[in-house]
C-alpha cells in the first residue's frame, strides 16, 4: 500500500469536500439568520450573510453581487466565482428569490 503525505491545509480541504452534506433545519425565516447564502433572484445573484428580515425584505451583510458565477457546481462546491463585486449591505425583495443555496465558504472581500 502506498502513502501520500499532504499538508494539513490540503487535508482539511479534501475532508470538507468529501464530508457529508451539512443538514440545515429551516422551519421559519428566522432560522436563516446568521447563515451564509448564495441567492439567485429573477435578475441577479448575491452571496452574503443573513442579518434579518424586515417585512418582505431580506437583509444581507457582507454581501457581494455575483456578475458571473462561472461553472455553477464549482462555485457552490469550491467557492470559486468568476466575477464578483463586494457591496456591503444589501436588501432583497423576497418575492424575487428563485432559490437559496448554503454558502460554505468565506464571503468575497475583493472585486474580481
Where do the model's predicted regions map?
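Conserved RNA-binding domains used in RNP assembly and mRNA/RNA metabolism
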Residues: 3-112
